């Protein structure tokens, strides 16, 4: 019989990260038994009674793992940087959910000239740590405008000169007459583990970590 102290809790967010984590779970012999897009449950069972999946916002995954709401989780590098990574063991870059963090502006905005002339830019983003460090390294003066969604609207409405956001194919930027002008960093998703849980549940967690590592090295099918 599985007791609460024996349960391994994995925090995931819906969408691309969830979908691309499934093959890694399969490599560890774990199958999620319900489709998060069809179920209203936030805690999903698996074929292993000692393993469960909790569905949280992408930005909350590191926090759940840090404070023990989950034993481990999968989260983007962008989210980890913004969180700070405190209290987290980060054993693996899983090489899934790849994209990039970039600077984008209106097609008619001369970004290069503005930077060269030392203009102070209004930058809209939810990635304030990444953006601030990037522009500081370039010696560009910026005022940050914290937004949580519909980032593309900011330059179109005059709220901001530029945005810093995740870019995958660039189709959303093009559809909104924006252009990518600088690539800040490449992003992929990482496995994060609660440090206390790794001591208390070392063997079961190590088995999952090792299975993920082997599947990542082999290139688990997406």
Curated annotation (Swiss-Prot):
Biological process annotations from GO = L-histidine biosynthetic process
Keyword match NADP: no
Compartments in which it is found: Cytoplasm
Cellular component per GO, a single term: cytoplasm
Q: Which GO terms describe its molecular function?
A: ATP binding; ATP phosphoribosyltransferase activity
Major place of residence: cytoplasm
Q: What is its EC number?
A: 2.4.2.17
Which reaction(s) are listed as its catalytic activity? 1-(5-phospho-beta-D-ribosyl)-ATP + diphosphate = 5-phospho-alpha-D-ribose 1-diphosphate + ATP
Q: Domain of life here?
A: Bacteria
What Pfam families does its record include? HisG
Give the first-level EC class, as a single word.
transferase
Known pathway = Amino-acid biosynthesis; L-histidine biosynthesis; L-histidine from 5-phospho-alpha-D-ribose 1-diphosphate: step 1/9
Entries under CDD domains matching the protein: PBP2_HisGs
What keywords sit in the KW lines?
Amino-acid biosynthesis, ATP-binding, Cytoplasm, Glycosyltransferase, Histidine biosynthesis, Nucleotide-binding, Transferase
Record-stated family? Belongs to the ATP phosphoribosyltransferase family. Short subfamily.
Question: What is said about the domains?
Answer: Lacks the C-terminal regulatory region which is replaced by HisZ.
Role this protein plays = Catalyzes the condensation of ATP and 5-phosphoribose 1-diphosphate to form N'-(5'-phosphoribosyl)-ATP (PR-ATP). Has a crucial role in the pathway because the rate of histidine biosynthesis seems to be controlled primarily by regulation of HisG enzymatic activity.
**Subunit-structure text:** Heteromultimer composed of HisG and HisZ subunits.
Name of the protein this chain belongs to = ATP phosphoribosyltransferase
Q: Quick one: which gene encodes this?
A: hisG
